[in-house]
Amino acid sequence: MNTNVTIAGVTFKNPVTTASGTFGSGMEYSEFVDLNRLGAITTKGVSSVPWPGNPVPRIAETYGGMLNAIGLQNPGVDMFVERDLAFLKQFDTKVIVNVCGKSVKEYVEVVERLSEEAVDLLELNISCPNVKEGCIAFGQDPKMIAMIMDEIKRHAKQPVIVKLSPNVTDITEMAKAAEAGGADALSLINTLTGMKIDINHRAFAIANKTGGMSGPAVKPIAVRMVYQVANAVKLPIIGMGGIQNAEDALEFIMAGATVVAVGTANFINPYATVEVIEGIEEFMRKNQISDINDLIGCVK
Protein backbone atom coordinates (compact mmCIF):
# COMPACT_ATOMS: atom_id res chain seq x y z
CA MET A 1 0.00 0.00 0.00
CA ASN A 2 1.56 3.28 -1.13
CA THR A 3 0.85 6.45 0.84
CA ASN A 4 3.70 8.49 -0.68
CA VAL A 5 2.77 11.74 -2.40
CA THR A 6 4.97 14.31 -4.11
CA ILE A 7 4.85 18.10 -4.19
CA ALA A 8 7.36 20.02 -6.30
CA GLY A 9 9.77 17.09 -6.32
CA VAL A 10 9.56 16.58 -2.55
CA THR A 11 8.17 13.19 -1.52
CA PHE A 12 6.08 12.88 1.64
CA LYS A 13 5.72 9.45 3.32
CA ASN A 14 2.00 10.18 3.71
CA PRO A 15 -0.30 13.06 2.74
CA VAL A 16 -0.70 14.63 6.19
CA THR A 17 0.98 17.73 7.56
CA THR A 18 0.12 20.29 10.22
CA ALA A 19 -1.43 23.68 9.55
CA SER A 20 0.84 26.60 10.36
CA GLY A 21 0.22 28.18 13.73
CA THR A 22 -1.48 25.17 15.29
CA PHE A 23 1.49 22.93 16.02
CA GLY A 24 4.38 25.31 16.71
CA SER A 25 7.42 23.43 15.48
CA GLY A 26 6.25 20.24 17.15
CA MET A 27 8.24 20.55 20.37
CA GLU A 28 5.27 20.35 22.74
CA TYR A 29 3.43 17.79 20.60
CA SER A 30 6.47 15.49 20.48
CA GLU A 31 5.54 14.48 24.04
CA PHE A 32 2.31 12.98 22.68
CA VAL A 33 3.02 11.79 19.14
CA ASP A 34 5.94 10.41 17.16
CA LEU A 35 6.77 13.25 14.79
CA ASN A 36 8.43 10.73 12.47
CA ARG A 37 4.91 9.49 11.71
CA LEU A 38 3.88 12.73 10.01
CA GLY A 39 4.26 13.38 6.32
CA ALA A 40 5.51 16.87 7.13
CA ILE A 41 5.51 19.53 9.81
CA THR A 42 4.50 23.04 8.78
CA THR A 43 5.90 25.55 11.24
CA LYS A 44 4.38 28.68 12.68
CA GLY A 45 4.97 31.84 10.62
CA VAL A 46 8.50 33.25 10.70
CA SER A 47 9.48 36.87 10.04
CA SER A 48 12.89 38.52 9.68
CA VAL A 49 12.74 40.10 13.14
CA PRO A 50 10.70 39.20 16.25
CA TRP A 51 7.00 40.11 16.10
CA PRO A 52 5.12 40.66 19.40
CA GLY A 53 1.73 39.84 17.87
CA ASN A 54 -1.58 41.54 18.60
CA PRO A 55 -2.85 42.72 22.01
CA VAL A 56 -4.96 40.36 24.14
CA PRO A 57 -7.58 38.99 24.19
CA ARG A 58 -6.81 37.38 20.85
CA ILE A 59 -8.70 34.07 20.90
CA ALA A 60 -12.45 33.45 21.15
CA GLU A 61 -14.50 30.27 20.82
CA THR A 62 -17.35 30.09 18.31
CA TYR A 63 -19.91 27.46 17.38
CA GLY A 64 -17.98 24.82 15.46
CA GLY A 65 -14.65 26.59 15.66
CA MET A 66 -12.66 29.51 16.97
CA LEU A 67 -11.48 33.00 16.14
CA ASN A 68 -7.84 33.98 16.51
CA ALA A 69 -5.96 37.21 16.09
CA ILE A 70 -2.54 36.15 17.34
CA GLY A 71 -0.87 38.40 14.80
CA LEU A 72 1.88 35.96 13.80
CA GLN A 73 3.83 36.38 17.03
CA ASN A 74 7.26 34.78 16.55
CA PRO A 75 10.88 35.15 17.72
CA GLY A 76 12.32 36.03 14.30
CA VAL A 77 14.16 33.90 11.79
CA ASP A 78 17.55 33.78 13.56
CA MET A 79 16.10 32.34 16.77
CA PHE A 80 13.87 30.06 14.71
CA VAL A 81 16.88 28.57 12.92
CA GLU A 82 18.86 28.21 16.14
CA ARG A 83 16.08 26.61 18.18
CA ASP A 84 13.27 25.22 16.04
CA LEU A 85 15.13 23.96 12.99
CA ALA A 86 17.80 22.45 15.24
CA PHE A 87 15.03 20.52 17.00
CA LEU A 88 13.39 19.36 13.76
CA LYS A 89 16.62 17.95 12.31
CA GLN A 90 16.31 14.86 14.49
CA PHE A 91 13.15 13.67 12.74
CA ASP A 92 12.65 11.88 9.43
CA THR A 93 9.82 14.20 8.47
CA LYS A 94 9.68 16.89 5.81
CA VAL A 95 9.82 20.48 7.04
CA ILE A 96 7.70 23.27 5.57
CA VAL A 97 8.49 26.73 6.94
CA ASN A 98 5.74 29.34 6.85
CA VAL A 99 7.20 32.73 5.87
CA CYS A 100 5.50 36.02 6.72
CA GLY A 101 6.39 39.66 6.24
CA LYS A 102 5.15 43.24 6.32
CA SER A 103 6.87 44.04 3.04
CA VAL A 104 8.26 42.22 0.02
CA LYS A 105 11.72 43.05 1.35
CA GLU A 106 11.01 41.23 4.61
CA TYR A 107 9.75 38.13 2.80
CA VAL A 108 12.94 38.10 0.74
CA GLU A 109 15.11 38.48 3.85
CA VAL A 110 13.53 35.42 5.47
CA VAL A 111 13.70 33.36 2.28
CA GLU A 112 17.39 34.19 1.84
CA ARG A 113 18.15 33.37 5.48
CA LEU A 114 16.52 29.94 5.06
CA SER A 115 18.08 29.19 1.68
CA GLU A 116 20.92 27.07 3.07
CA GLU A 117 19.01 25.51 5.96
CA ALA A 118 17.45 22.04 6.27
CA VAL A 119 14.06 23.16 4.97
CA ASP A 120 12.20 21.18 2.32
CA LEU A 121 9.59 23.72 1.24
CA LEU A 122 8.61 27.31 1.99
CA GLU A 123 4.99 28.35 2.54
CA LEU A 124 4.47 32.00 1.68
CA ASN A 125 1.84 33.46 4.00
CA ILE A 126 0.22 36.27 2.03
CA SER A 127 -3.22 35.67 3.50
CA CYS A 128 -3.28 36.09 7.29
CA PRO A 129 -6.43 38.15 7.98
CA ASN A 130 -5.36 39.61 11.33
CA VAL A 131 -2.09 41.33 10.41
CA LYS A 132 -2.67 44.87 9.19
CA GLU A 133 0.56 45.23 7.22
CA GLY A 134 1.56 42.82 4.44
CA CYS A 135 -0.02 39.36 4.45
CA ILE A 136 -3.71 39.76 3.62
CA ALA A 137 -3.11 43.05 1.76
CA PHE A 138 -0.91 41.10 -0.65
CA GLY A 139 -3.16 38.06 -0.85
CA GLN A 140 -6.24 39.87 -2.14
CA ASP A 141 -4.62 41.40 -5.22
CA PRO A 142 -3.72 39.01 -8.07
CA LYS A 143 -1.20 41.45 -9.56
CA MET A 144 0.52 41.77 -6.19
CA ILE A 145 0.59 37.98 -5.77
CA ALA A 146 2.27 37.52 -9.15
CA MET A 147 4.76 40.29 -8.40
CA ILE A 148 5.69 38.91 -4.98
CA MET A 149 6.08 35.39 -6.34
CA ASP A 150 8.31 36.59 -9.15
CA GLU A 151 10.55 38.35 -6.63
CA ILE A 152 10.60 35.47 -4.13
CA LYS A 153 11.50 32.93 -6.82
CA ARG A 154 14.63 34.94 -7.60
CA HIS A 155 15.92 34.26 -4.09
CA ALA A 156 14.38 30.96 -2.97
CA LYS A 157 16.43 27.77 -3.09
CA GLN A 158 13.49 25.63 -1.96
CA PRO A 159 10.13 25.13 -3.73
CA VAL A 160 7.58 27.79 -2.77
CA ILE A 161 3.97 27.16 -1.72
CA VAL A 162 1.59 30.13 -1.75
CA LYS A 163 -1.06 30.13 0.98
CA LEU A 164 -4.30 31.55 -0.37
CA SER A 165 -6.96 33.59 1.40
CA PRO A 166 -10.64 32.63 1.23
CA ASN A 167 -11.53 36.28 1.85
CA VAL A 168 -11.73 37.11 -1.85
CA THR A 169 -14.42 37.18 -4.52
CA ASP A 170 -12.83 34.46 -6.66
CA ILE A 171 -10.06 32.34 -5.18
CA THR A 172 -9.25 30.82 -8.57
CA GLU A 173 -8.03 34.22 -9.79
CA MET A 174 -5.55 34.33 -6.91
CA ALA A 175 -4.47 30.76 -7.67
CA LYS A 176 -3.88 31.60 -11.32
CA ALA A 177 -1.84 34.66 -10.33
CA ALA A 178 0.35 32.55 -8.04
CA GLU A 179 0.84 30.01 -10.80
CA ALA A 180 1.75 32.75 -13.27
CA GLY A 181 4.27 34.13 -10.78
CA GLY A 182 6.06 30.79 -10.54
CA ALA A 183 4.56 29.17 -7.45
CA ASP A 184 5.40 25.49 -7.09
CA ALA A 185 2.27 24.62 -5.07
CA LEU A 186 -0.69 26.18 -3.28
CA SER A 187 -2.15 25.77 0.20
CA LEU A 188 -5.72 26.67 1.05
CA ILE A 189 -7.66 27.86 2.80
CA ASN A 190 -6.34 30.28 5.36
CA THR A 191 -8.86 31.46 7.94
CA LEU A 192 -12.08 33.33 7.19
CA THR A 193 -12.44 36.79 8.69
CA GLY A 194 -14.98 36.79 11.53
CA MET A 195 -16.13 38.74 14.56
CA LYS A 196 -17.64 38.03 17.97
CA ILE A 197 -19.24 40.49 20.39
CA ASP A 198 -19.18 40.17 24.18
CA ILE A 199 -22.75 41.30 24.87
CA ASN A 200 -22.24 41.57 28.65
CA HIS A 201 -19.36 44.02 28.30
CA ARG A 202 -20.65 45.53 25.05
CA ALA A 203 -17.23 45.06 23.55
CA PHE A 204 -15.41 43.03 20.95
CA ALA A 205 -14.45 39.56 22.15
CA ILE A 206 -11.06 40.05 20.48
CA ALA A 207 -8.98 43.21 20.94
CA ASN A 208 -8.23 43.26 17.22
CA LYS A 209 -12.04 43.40 16.62
CA THR A 210 -11.84 40.74 13.91
CA GLY A 211 -10.04 37.42 13.79
CA GLY A 212 -9.47 34.42 11.59
CA MET A 213 -12.16 31.74 11.90
CA SER A 214 -11.12 28.10 11.73
CA GLY A 215 -12.53 24.75 12.76
CA PRO A 216 -15.19 22.31 11.51
CA ALA A 217 -17.65 25.04 10.52
CA VAL A 218 -15.41 26.20 7.64
CA LYS A 219 -14.82 22.76 6.11
CA PRO A 220 -17.54 22.78 3.41
CA ILE A 221 -16.27 26.15 2.19
CA ALA A 222 -12.68 24.90 2.19
CA VAL A 223 -13.50 21.69 0.30
CA ARG A 224 -15.39 23.70 -2.32
CA MET A 225 -12.48 26.09 -2.80
CA VAL A 226 -9.95 23.25 -3.08
CA TYR A 227 -12.11 21.67 -5.77
CA GLN A 228 -12.39 24.96 -7.66
CA VAL A 229 -8.67 25.67 -7.52
CA ALA A 230 -7.72 22.10 -8.45
CA ASN A 231 -9.77 22.51 -11.60
CA ALA A 232 -8.37 25.96 -12.40
CA VAL A 233 -4.59 25.42 -12.16
CA LYS A 234 -2.08 22.61 -12.58
CA LEU A 235 -0.27 23.09 -9.28
CA PRO A 236 -0.41 20.57 -6.41
CA ILE A 237 -2.53 21.65 -3.45
CA ILE A 238 -2.26 21.35 0.31
CA GLY A 239 -5.87 21.40 1.49
CA MET A 240 -6.99 22.52 4.93
CA GLY A 241 -9.91 23.94 6.84
CA GLY A 242 -11.78 22.13 9.59
CA ILE A 243 -10.20 18.70 9.26
CA GLN A 244 -10.99 16.66 12.37
CA ASN A 245 -10.64 13.08 11.16
CA ALA A 246 -9.71 10.87 8.22
CA GLU A 247 -13.11 11.25 6.58
CA ASP A 248 -12.62 15.02 6.45
CA ALA A 249 -9.11 14.58 5.07
CA LEU A 250 -10.29 12.22 2.37
CA GLU A 251 -12.90 14.74 1.24
CA PHE A 252 -10.10 17.22 0.55
CA ILE A 253 -8.01 14.60 -1.24
CA MET A 254 -10.91 13.52 -3.44
CA ALA A 255 -11.62 17.19 -4.19
CA GLY A 256 -8.07 17.58 -5.51
CA ALA A 257 -5.63 18.06 -2.62
CA THR A 258 -2.35 16.14 -2.77
CA VAL A 259 -1.63 16.81 0.91
CA VAL A 260 -3.93 17.80 3.78
CA ALA A 261 -3.12 19.91 6.84
CA VAL A 262 -4.64 19.36 10.27
CA GLY A 263 -5.03 22.61 12.21
CA THR A 264 -7.51 23.57 14.92
CA ALA A 265 -8.10 19.90 15.77
CA ASN A 266 -4.61 19.85 17.29
CA PHE A 267 -5.78 22.20 20.05
CA ILE A 268 -8.54 19.78 21.00
CA ASN A 269 -6.72 16.51 20.46
CA PRO A 270 -2.90 16.37 20.35
CA TYR A 271 -3.12 12.97 18.63
CA ALA A 272 -5.26 14.32 15.76
CA THR A 273 -2.61 14.20 13.03
CA VAL A 274 -1.62 10.61 13.69
CA GLU A 275 -5.26 9.55 13.98
CA VAL A 276 -5.94 11.10 10.57
CA ILE A 277 -3.00 9.19 9.07
CA GLU A 278 -4.15 5.92 10.63
CA GLY A 279 -7.71 6.54 9.43
CA ILE A 280 -6.59 7.13 5.86
CA GLU A 281 -4.55 3.92 5.94
CA GLU A 282 -7.53 1.99 7.33
CA PHE A 283 -9.79 3.40 4.59
CA MET A 284 -7.30 2.28 1.95
CA ARG A 285 -7.09 -1.24 3.39
CA LYS A 286 -10.85 -1.56 3.77
CA ASN A 287 -11.48 -0.40 0.20
CA GLN A 288 -8.49 -2.24 -1.30
CA ILE A 289 -6.85 0.96 -2.55
CA SER A 290 -3.20 0.30 -3.29
CA ASP A 291 -2.09 3.89 -3.99
CA ILE A 292 -3.29 7.08 -2.29
CA ASN A 293 -2.59 8.98 -5.50
CA ASP A 294 -5.54 7.20 -7.12
CA LEU A 295 -7.84 9.16 -4.80
CA ILE A 296 -6.46 12.63 -5.54
CA GLY A 297 -9.09 14.58 -7.45
CA CYS A 298 -11.13 11.45 -8.13
CA VAL A 299 -14.42 13.33 -7.74
CA LYS A 300 -15.15 15.13 -10.99
Swiss-Prot record:
Substrate binds at K44, N68, A69, I70, G71, L72, N125, N190, T191. Pfam families: DHO_dh. It comes from the Bacteria. CDD domains: DHOD_1B_like. Its cofactor is FMN. Pathway: Pyrimidine metabolism; UMP biosynthesis via de novo pathway; orotate from (S)-dihydroorotate (NAD(+) route): step 1/1. It catalyses: (S)-dihydroorotate + NAD(+) = orotate + NADH + H(+). It is found in: Cytoplasm. GO terms for biological process: 'de novo' pyrimidine nucleobase biosynthetic process; 'de novo' UMP biosynthetic process. It is an enzyme of class 1 (oxidoreductase). Heterotetramer of 2 PyrK and 2 PyrD type B subunits. Catalyzes the conversion of dihydroorotate to orotate with NAD(+) as electron acceptor. This is Dihydroorotate dehydrogenase B (NAD(+)), catalytic subunit. It comes from Lachnoclostridium phytofermentans (strain ATCC 700394 / DSM 18823 / ISDg) (Clostridium phytofermentans). The lineage of its organism: Bacteria, Bacillati, Bacillota, Clostridia, Lachnospirales. The gene is pyrD.
